[in-house]
Each structure stands twice: as C-alpha cells, then as structure tokens.
C-alpha cells in the first residue's frame, strides 16, 4: 500500500520525467531486452535494434500506462483495468516480466535523475512499480 509520502515521491519523480516519458519507456524496453533476453519472446515481430520505431512506439505505450497510473495513483487498478485484461487474457505475458520492466525503469530513472532518486524516493518508486505490476497480473487468477 502506498503511503501519502510514497504518492508524493512518485508524483515528484514523474514531474521531473516530464516530456521524456516516451524516451524513458523505450530505453526501459531496450534495457529489459538486453538484461532479460527471454522477454524478447513476446515481441517476435519487433525490430529490437536500438532506436527502432517499434520499440519507440511500445515504449510510448509503457510510458503512457505509467503516467496513467500516476495520474490515478489512488485507483491504479481502475486506471489500468483494460490493460490488465489485455495482458492476462490475450497476451498472456509471464507475470515476472513486469518485475523486470519495473527494475529496468528504476535504472533508467537513476541514470537520468540520480539526485532525485534518494533512498526514500527509490523505495516509493519501487513500491509504485510493484503496485502497477500487481494490478497488471491480478486478473491472471
């Protein structure tokens, strides 16, 4: 459960990300494909080269979902309900991949905003990303 301080910290980080969210989403995917190559199996039709249009487009979707979750931080489940349905019922993505994606997003934020990622903010952002992952896998059961 995200505390009031967690919510403030997460919103603060996303305010710093601002207009870079789409780029960070693509960078997160690229990092995930390199660090966790098994995740590529869900994207057999993608050009997985650095900077590909497909990675940029999907990175934009990832970023939009995270921004949507931040904008509805008190109802992440409601905000991401359709996305949860899609991943559970149609795409059938292994739930562990959301943890991988969250970890890679944390790394991207740390690279671009090292001073913003204090231990407290890091913990809050990690809790938020875990909450998003939990929502996206909730309908697997």
Swiss-Prot record:
Domain of life (superkingdom): Eukaryota
Organism: Cygnus olor
Name this polypeptide is given: Hemoglobin subunit alpha-A
Any GO BP annotation: hydrogen peroxide catabolic process
Gene: HBAA
Pfam families found in the cross-reference section: Globin
Stated role: Involved in oxygen transport from the lung to the various peripheral tissues.
Residues that, per the record, bind heme b: 87
Gene Ontology MF terms: haptoglobin binding; heme binding; iron ion binding; organic acid binding; oxygen binding; oxygen carrier activity; peroxidase activity
């Amino acid at each position: 459960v995200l505390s009031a301080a967690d919510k403030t910290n997460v919103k603060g980080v996303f305010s710093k990300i601002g207009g870079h969210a789409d780029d960070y989403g693509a960078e997160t995917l690229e990092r995930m494909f390199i660090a966790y190559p098994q995740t590529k199996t869900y994207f057999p039709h993608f050009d997985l080269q650095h900077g590909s249009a497909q990675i940029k487009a999907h990175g934009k979707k990832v970023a939009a979902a995270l921004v949507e979750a931040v904008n509805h931080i008190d109802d992440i489940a409601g905000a991401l309900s359709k996305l949860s349905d899609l991943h559970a019922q149609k795409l059938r993505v292994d739930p562990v991949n959301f943890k991988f994606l969250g970890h890679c997003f944390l790394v991207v934020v740390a690279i671009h905003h090292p001073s913003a990622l204090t231990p407290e903010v890091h913990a809050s952002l990690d809790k938020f990303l875990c909450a998003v992952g939990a929502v996206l896998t909730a309908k697997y059961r």
